[in-house]
Structures are given as structure tokens and as C-alpha cells.
């Protein structure tokens, strides 16, 4: 069945309190998607972000981002008083997230909520909390990790004293006793996060909207996952990485890309029948309806850079687990529900892996406009319907911003191909050809639908300091844009069957 939808991260939803949350505005967005005839809502990883604010660098592959907890919902639950959070000036400009202000204020407010939760926990909530802790075995290691980070002033676990860094049994046991209350605080945050998330997901599903989630291929070095299961990564006896992930120098980057993530010990993972990945994918498939796996080509082969290098020079290519991993994942978690982010160098070996896995790959229209007209990303050249077409992604500029930075020859080709005369017409033309393509799924962004330029870009890869900040305003979600998208979706045969609307939250 042909489908379509919008890519909009939770953080980019509007509200008064600094960052998008799983509160009222998220439910309103589901209602808007329904009115626009859509069936998909794609988000970025829900993971708790670390320094740099990227959802692709997190303290845990399992833990949700506490910033997405709705403070208004906590007030409704009796855990907060309105004044305790409403009087805070969360941001100077509602268009952009101020992460420094969020960090300074959010956890203070949540400590107040936790205090009331601890005192008043009883009955159904108490049983629900106990069940949550019992059903999530990752929680103990994660909460201890966060408590210890606080105790060490936010320092990476790599800088902790040796017994804790190497997870000496006695040291870990003592830390659990010493920081039990802090661990419970972080468990409370996760309890509230997942409580709100699954209610929102159910509301979306009840209204015919599937959630497309996203998981990074690699873990951050400073994460509970690497600290607790160091044997699964290429680290030395002192838990220092021997190699890190990245991408070699090419025509676009003289020094290549140095991502810095530790690389998996795939031989060890295979010996354990990919237990770690099966657990991760099982969790992700519960969290989302469809899972987009970032940097899928890294499972075919990966570029390993010696730890300590300042650039990506000097790295080497190595074979990844290839289909062996996905064969196990399919057997243990089911066949469907995965999108492969297959952007990059597509070798015959990568094509073989994609064919074996049978996951839909991605087609980004901004990559399509080679003036020869032969690009595999142009809709006329798609060889399979088993793909997802995007007008743009979180890592690219908006269509308008992209167009404004093209050379004159390519601009002319784009205009001729799309049949537009002015740059302002481009975003709508992009959406039009994506929706009318043969791809099974078509996705655009709210930035595209609103016709925004580079000012609305989410992320510029390999840069830090000004990414992941852009947000929508309530005024962006117009009845006019919903009606336009609804009609386009209908004539493109992507509109889902009409269902009776479910009650609002």
C-alpha cells in the first residue's frame, strides 16, 4: 500500500517551554496529520542527548530524552505546580531551542516532580512503576551510569577512577548503594518518558498514523552501553578504543569525517549470536512501528581510524557482518518494519546486502539532479517500488536552501525538470514529484511544506554548536497546507482508508 508522511522530530514541535514534548502539541500534530491525509510520522532518535545535543550521540541506546516529557502532563498528574515551570524563561526565540537554558532549568523542575512522586507513590502508579523497572533490565546500568556522571561533574566514564572505569564488582556494588536515590531519580524520568510516549504512540496508531523511528548504527563512547558491555567493542584492556568510526577523505572533504564512535567487535558479537543487536532491534520495534537504521552501508563494510588521529586519514576498510546479522534479526524479531538508510558509496557488495535484506532503501531528491537525467534518485529511474523517497532529510538543507546554493547550469536543469519558473515554487514541486513517484513511501518535512529556506535547516553534518535547534510554531500548521497535502495524497493514491476519528486526549 502506498503511503506518505511528514518528518518532524519531537524536539521541533511548538510549545511555551523551550522544546517540543509529548504533550498537547504532539497530539495536535497527529490530528493535523490525519486532516492532511497522511499515514506516517517520522521522527529522529528519541535517545537522551549528550554534549552537542545530537540525537545520534546519546548516553544510552535505550533511554528516552527526558526533555520530551510534558511538564503540563506532570501538572495534570499532580507532580508539578504550574508556577514551578511556567515562570521560567525557557527561550529567547520560540523558533530555536536554547539547550543551555534547558539544561540549567529542566532537571531542577524534574527534581520537584520526583520529590512528589516519591512521597505520593501508591496504588496503580506504584504497581505500574514496579512493572516498568522489572520489564527494562537496561535501567539499572543506565541509572547508575547517570548517577556516577553527576557525581563526577559530568565527566566521561573514561575519566573515572580505575575501579569504576573497569567496573570492578566491589566498586559497582558500593556505588549502587551510595547513589541509590539518584538512580531512582533517573528511573523516574524514564518511567514518565515511556509512559507518555506509549500513550502518544497509541493515539497516533488509533488515528491511522504509523511512527517511523530512527536508530544510529554506532553508540557514543561516553554511554552506558559501552561502559557496561565493553567486550563488544574494539577497546584495549584499559577500555580505550583502538579504532573509531568515520569516513575517508573524498572530493567533498579533504580530511574525511572523524565521527569518533567506538567500533563493534563483530567477531565477538557473532559468537554471542548477535544477542546485543537482537535486543536492540526488539526494543526499537516495540518503540516504533517502522525503524530506520542509520548508515546501513556500515554493516557491509566500515572505515576504522586509529584512535587519537586528528583526521580520517590513515584509516582502513574492514568487512562488516553483512547479511549474517540481518538473517538473525529477521529470525528473532520478524521480517518487516525496517528502512535502510543506504546513502553513500553504493558498491556491488552493498547492493547485494540490500537485495538479501529486502529492506526499502532511501531516495533523496536533492541527490537526483545530475543534468544528464540519469541519476538513480530521479523518480523516472527508480527500478523498484520498494523504497522511500524524501524531498530532504535532517542532514540536508531544505529544498529551497539547497536550490539557492546550486550553480547556474544545475538550477536551470532543476527548473526545466520540475516545470517551475521561480525558486519559491520549488518546495511544492518537490513534494509533488515525490508523492507521484512509484516509491512505496513518500516523505517530506514541515520546513518544505512551509517553503522555508536554510534558516530552518536542522543539522549540518560534521559541524557543532548550532544544530538540532530549529522548531515549528503553531501557526505553521495551517488548514490550507493540510488541504493541499490531503488532495495531493488522494490523487497520488497514497491516502489511507477513512477511519472513524478517535477521541482526543
Model regions and ranges:
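N-terminal regions that are enriched for targeting/export leaders
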Residues: 1-11, 27
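Alpha-amylase-like alpha-glycosidases and glucanotransferases acting on alpha-linked glucans and related
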Residues: 9, 15, 53-190, 194, ...
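Catalytic domains of carbohydrate-active enzymes, especially glycoside hydrolases
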Residues: 24-49, 287-288, 434-436
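Surface-exposed amphipathic alpha-helices with a cationic face
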Residues: 34, 197-205, 330, 354-355
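Outer-envelope exported proteins of Gram-negative bacteria
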Residues: 44, 210-212, 216, 290, ...
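Conserved, well-ordered alpha-helix/loop/beta-strand core segments that scaffold catalytic motifs
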Residues: 186, 190-219
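C-terminal accessory segments of extracellular proteins
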Residues: 480-495
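Short Lys/Arg-rich cationic patches that frequently serve as NLS/NoLS or arginine-rich RNA/DNA-binding motifs
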Residues: 497-505
Amino acid at each position: 500500500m502506498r503511503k506518505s508522511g511528514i518528518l518532524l522530530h519531537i524536539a521541533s514541535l511548538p510549545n511555551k517551554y523551550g522544546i517540543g514534548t509529548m504533550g498537547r502539541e504532539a497530539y495536535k500534530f497527529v490530528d493535523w496529520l490525519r486532516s492532511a491525509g497522511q499515514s506516517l510520522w517520522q521522527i529522529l532518535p528519541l535517545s537522551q542527548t549528550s554534549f552537542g545535543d545530537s540525537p545520534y550521540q546519546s548516553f544510552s541506546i535505550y533511554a528516552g530524552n527526558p526533555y520530551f516529557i510534558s511538564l503540563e502532563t506532570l501538572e495534570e498528574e499532580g507532580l508539578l505546580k504550574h508556577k514551578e515551570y511556567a515562570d521560567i524563561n525557557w527561550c529567547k526565540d520560540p523558533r530555536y531551542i536554547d539547550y543551555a537554558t534547558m539544561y540549567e532549568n529542566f532537571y531542577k523542575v524534574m527534581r520537584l516532580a520526583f520529590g512528589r512522586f516519591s512521597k505520593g507513590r501508591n496504588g496503580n502508579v506504584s504497581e505500574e512503576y514496579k512493572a516498568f523497572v522489572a520489564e527494562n533490565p537496561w535501567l539499572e546500568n543506565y541509572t547508575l551510569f547517570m548517577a556516577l556522571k553527576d557525581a563526577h561533574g559530568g565527566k566521561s566514564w573514561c575519566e573515572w577512577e580505575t575501579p569504576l572505569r573497569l567496573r570492578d564488582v566491589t566498586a559497582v556494588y558500593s556505588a549502587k548503594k551510595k547513589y541509590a536515590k539518584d538512580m531512582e531519580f533517573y528511573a523516574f524520568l524514564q518511567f514518565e518518558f515511556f509512559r507518555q510516549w506509549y500513550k502518544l504512540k497509541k493515539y497516533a496508531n488509533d488515528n491511522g498514523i504509523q511512527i517511523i523511528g530512527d536508530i544510529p548504527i554506532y553508540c557514543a563512547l561516553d554511554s552506558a552501553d559501552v561502559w557496561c558491555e565493553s567486550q563488544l567493542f574494539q577497546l584495549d584492556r584499559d577500555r580505550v578504543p583502538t579504532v573509531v568510526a568515520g569516513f575517508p577523505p573524498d572530493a567533498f572533504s579533504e580530511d574525511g569525517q572523524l565521527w569518533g564512535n567506538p567500533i563493534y567487535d563483530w567477531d565477538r558479537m557473532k559468537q554471542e549470536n548477535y544477542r546485543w543487536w537482537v535486543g536492540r532491534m526488539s526494543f526499537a520495534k516495540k518503540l516504533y512501528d517502522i525503524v530506520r537504521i542509520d548508515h546501513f552501508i556500515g554493516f557491509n563494510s566500515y572505515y576504522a581510524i586509529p584512535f587519537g588521529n586528528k583526521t580520517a586519514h590513515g584509516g582502513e576498510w574492514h568487512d562488516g557482518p553483512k547479511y549474517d546479522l540481518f538473517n538473525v534479526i529477521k529470525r528473532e524479531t520478524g521480517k518487516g518494519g525496517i528502512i535502510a538508510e543506504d546513502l553513500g558509496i553504493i558498491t556491488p557488495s552493498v547492493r547485494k546486502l540490500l537485495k538479501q535484506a529486502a529492506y526499502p532503501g532511501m531516495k533523496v531528491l536533492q541527490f537526483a539532479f545530475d543534468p544528464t537525467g540519469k541519476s538513480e534518485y530521479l523518480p523516472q529511474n527508480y527500478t523498484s517500488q520498494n523504497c522511500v523517497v524524501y524531498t530532504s532529510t535532517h542532514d540536508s538543507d531544505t529544498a529551497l536552501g539547497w536550490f539557492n546554493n546550486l550553480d547556474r547550469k544545475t538550477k536551470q536543469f532543476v527548473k526545466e525538470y520540475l516545470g517551475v519558473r521561480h525558486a519559491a515554487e520549488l518546495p511544492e514541486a518537490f513534494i509533488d514529484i515525490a508523492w507521484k513517484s512509484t516509491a512505496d513511501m513518500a516523505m517530506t518535512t514541515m520546513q518544505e511544506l512551509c517553503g522555508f529556506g536554510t534558516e530552518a535547516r536542522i543539522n549540518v553534518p560534521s559541524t557543532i554548536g548550532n544544530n538540532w535547534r530549529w522548531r515549528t510554531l503553531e501557526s505553521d500548521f495551517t488548514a490550507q497546507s493540510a488541504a493541499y497535502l490531503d488532495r495531493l495524497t488522494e490523487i497520488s493514491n497514497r491516502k489511507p482508508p477513512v477511519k472513524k476519528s478517535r477521541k482526543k486526549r
